[in-house]
């Protein structure tokens, strides 16, 4: 504006200060040439403003009025119920209902004859409204209207927008019976506590019977029944029973059951047993040492916890005593593919399990050694001295075998090395981690450094791992399943 006016009238800048806008516009208004356009433009707003103000003045109040005059979303029954409930004695006359509705909702201030007629119809036609005769003490005209005591729950959650159903007096006995049925169970359970316990004991006894039948049907697999419907209380009740019937409760008593699994021809290795072993912690609550070490086992894993020892013990026993021990090497190394391969990196093993392993290095006190699971995995990974130590403990009647395993497993391990190269990558690590079972990796860098050191110092691996010949085929063969290990680089590069 300033530049435009200064160009059209350069004398204005000489008279008026440049930045004082009030003086500028006051001075600019004094010029004749400027006054005519200013007058035109200033006159038009006045003209249009006055004209619009006069012509549209009645309409300014109309948009506000329809907002007040919108019909409320309440039914006539809801309006009458509101009026009755807001009355001091929960009863109100017909005129009181009219007045309440008009005071609350301005929409009903007009067309009174129409909606008041509807109010009277609803009062007389609906059974939820009861007419109360007027007392003689209170002078006035008309009777009082009140709500039927059984119709107070007519609206859902106290909202007048929704009514459940049309209230009828003949439905009141049915409603009372339904309420009585709904109210009966809590006092019945409180009063009849002794009667409720046999009902609760019924399913538990049935579940126990199922477990007993499974024991009688297959003595080699005591508690392998999949009782998914076990409640936590039932599982806790069945836990002493399962620990008593499970032969893995004591290492010496586990021998006859483990060897009895062989004549049945049960497969020692299957996908189901692997997935069961992976989902449920090995060992369970069967050993008190596990509870001391802080192993947290869900109670529903109890029926599964006893099955893996009997399944894996058969190839474990065959691997030491029978000549064809290739099945043992395959099964135990394949088992390490799922459970043992992640252990050197301490990625998937919970810390409580590592503490349990470090607290019980070897011998009868180890909960996993008693179940013949973790010891077999670690032995299959390369710590064969530790492995034989466990098996000399688990088979006291057999003479302790030589430190070097029989030469028969080597072709089998070479044949299975195409998918177990990561076992070869890790085969020297158990010598450092599980043979002593006291060393842990504080960070990832030390883990990889120890891995390289173990590769360079092969003599150290041979001294601590008494089966160095098993490591060579795994170390030389490239891996197909590199992602199965926590680290995926090929050890032949280093």
UniProtKB/Swiss-Prot annotation:
User: What is the stated purpose of this protein?
Assistant: Transcriptional activator.
Q: How is it modified after translation?
A: Phosphorylation regulates FOXC2 transcriptional activity by promoting its recruitment to chromatin.
- Stretches with biased composition (Pro residues): 397-410
- Look up the domain of life of the source: Eukaryota
Gene name of the encoded protein = Foxc2
Q: Name one GO biological process term.
A: negative regulation of transcription by RNA polymerase II
Modified residues annotated as Asymmetric dimethylarginine in this record: 452
Where are the compositionally biased (Polar residues) regions? 239-248
Q: Which organism is it from?
A: Rattus norvegicus
Cross-link entry Glycyl lysine isopeptide (Lys-Gly) (interchain with G-Cter in SUMO2), positions: 183, 213
Gene Ontology molecular function: any one: RNA polymerase II transcription regulatory region sequence-specific DNA binding
List residues, modification Phosphoserine: 214, 218, 231, 239, 250, 280, 287, 366
Q: Bias regions of kind Basic residues — which residues?
A: 385-394
Enumerate the SMART domains for this protein: FH
Q: Which residue ranges are recorded for the region named Disordered?
A: 166-213, 233-267, 380-422
Put simply, this protein is called Forkhead box protein C2
Give me the positions annotated for DNA binding: 71-165
Q: Which GO terms describe its cellular component?
A: nucleus
Compositional bias ranges of the Basic and acidic residues kind = 170-184, 202-212
């Amino acid at each position: 504006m300033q530049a435009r006016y200064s160009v059209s009238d350069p004398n204005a800048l000489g008279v008026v200060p440049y930045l004082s806008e009030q003086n500028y516009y006051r001075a600019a208004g004094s010029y004749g040439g400027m006054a005519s356009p200013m007058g035109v433009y200033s006159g038009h707003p006045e003209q249009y403003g006055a004209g619009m103000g006069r012509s549209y003045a009645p309409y300014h109040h109309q948009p506000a009025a329809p907002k007040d005059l919108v019909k409320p979303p309440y039914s006539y029954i809801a309006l009458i119920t509101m009026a009755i409930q807001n009355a001091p004695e929960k009863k109100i006359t017909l005129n009181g209902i009219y007045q309440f509705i008009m005071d609350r909702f301005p929409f009903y201030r007009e067309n009174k004859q129409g909606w008041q007629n509807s109010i009277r119809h609803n009062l007389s036609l609906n059974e939820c409204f009861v007419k109360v005769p007027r007392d003689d003490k209170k002078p006035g005209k008309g009777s009082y209207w009140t709500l039927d005591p059984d119709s107070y729950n007519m609206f859902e959650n106290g909202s007048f927008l929704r009514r459940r159903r049309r209230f009828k007096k003949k439905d009141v006995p049915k409603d009372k019976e339904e309420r009585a049925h709904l109210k009966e169970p809590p006092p019945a359970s409180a009063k009849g506590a002794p009667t409720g316990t046999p009902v609760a004991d019924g399913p538990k006894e049935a579940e126990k019977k199922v477990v007993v039948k499974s024991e009688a049907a297959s003595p080699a697999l005591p508690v392998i029944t999949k009782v998914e419907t076990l409640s936590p209380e039932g599982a806790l009740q069945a836990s002493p029973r399962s620990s008593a019937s499970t032969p893995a409760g004591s290492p010496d008593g586990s021998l006859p059951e483990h060897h009895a699994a062989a004549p049945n021809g049960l497969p020692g290795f299957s996908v189901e047993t692997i997935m069961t072993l992976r989902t449920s912690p090995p060992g369970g609550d069967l050993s008190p040492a596990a509870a001391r070490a802080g192993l947290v086992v869900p109670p529903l894993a109890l029926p599964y916890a006893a099955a893996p020892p009997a399944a894996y013990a058969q190839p474990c026993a065959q691997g030491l005593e029978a000549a064809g021990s290739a099945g043992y090497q395959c099964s135990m190394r394949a088992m390490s593919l799922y459970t043992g391969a992640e252990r050197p990196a301490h990625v998937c093993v919970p810390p409580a399990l590592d503490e349990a392993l470090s607290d019980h290095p070897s011998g009868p006190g180890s909960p996993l050694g008693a179940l013949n699971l973790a010891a077999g995995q670690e032995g299959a990974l390369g710590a064969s001295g530790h492995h034989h130590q466990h098996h000399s403990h688990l088979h006291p009647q057999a003479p302790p075998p030589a430190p070097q395993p029989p030469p028969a497993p080597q072709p089998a391990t070479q044949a299975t090395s195409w998918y177990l190269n990561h076992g070869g990558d890790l085969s020297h690590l158990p010598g450092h981690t599980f043979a002593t079972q006291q060393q842990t990796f504080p960070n990832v860098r030390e883990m990889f450094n120890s891995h390289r050191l173990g590769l360079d110092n092969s003599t150290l691996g041979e001294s601590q791992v008494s089966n160095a010949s098993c490591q060579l085929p795994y170390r030389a063969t490239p891996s197909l399943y590199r992602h199965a290990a926590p680290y995926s680089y090929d050890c032949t590069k280093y």
